[in-house]
Design a protein with these regions (language model features):
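Radical SAM/AdoMet-radical enzyme domain recognition
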Residues: 1-8
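A generic short-segment signal for beta-strand/edge and adjacent turn/coil regions
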Residues: 10-13, 73-75
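Glycine-rich beta-alpha junction loops
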Residues: 12-15, 45-47
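Auxiliary Fe-S-binding modules of radical SAM enzymes
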Residues: 22-171
Length: 171
């Protein structure tokens, strides 16, 4: 049986408590420990959108985003990729990296953020600069993480393995 690695995460700032965030992250960790299927955890801050029921809702403060990223890193450890969308927190990207993310996610110079089209992706050069400020570097990757390519019998059709292997750095 082929399995599907995927992304999961939590949306913060919608009325939940810190305890509820921890409980949600612990539930995701328990699921991942059972199935090994979560490639990355996204910690996404709520952004109010016009013409929605939550248009007037307050957005979470930066310290709440940073706290939640740090807790996610503690809960999942260094083996899990932790993401936060860079287009939703302009001007504080080094702080987000320092809180514990190691991946910006699907940033694209070609397509908009379909979930938050009002918040354009940062230019890749700017994102690379701000990532360097935090002592890290920006690197392009496939949507499938190297560890899943390495364990291809479990996660991939065998016919795709050699092609993907040639595209994955460090495998």
């Amino acid at each position: 049986v082929m399995r599907v690695p995927f992304t999961s995460g939590i949306l913060i700032g919608i009325g939940e408590t810190r305890r509820e965030r921890i409980e949600s992250l612990l539930a995701l960790r328990a699921s991942h420990r059972r199935h090994g299927h979560i490639q990355e955890i996204i910690v996404q801050n709520f952004k109010a959108k016009p013409d929605t029921n939550m248009a007037g809702a307050p957005e979470p403060e930066l310290n709440e985003l940073l706290w939640t990223i740090a807790i996610a890193r503690i809960i999942f450890g260094s083996d899990m990729s932790i993401q936060a969308p860079p287009n939703l927190s302009p001007g504080v990207l080094p702080q987000i990296v320092n809180a514990g993310i190691n991946d910006w996610g699907g940033v694209s110079p070609l397509t908009p953020d379909y979930v938050n089209p009002e918040a354009p992706w940062p230019h890749l050069d700017k994102l690379a600069r701000e990532t360097r400020v935090a002592g890290k570097f920006l690197e392009q990757r496939l949507t499938l993480y190297p560890r899943y390519v390495q364990d291809y019998p479990r996660w991939l059709d065998a016919g795709l393995h050699s092609q993907l292997l040639s595209m994955v750095d460090g495998v």
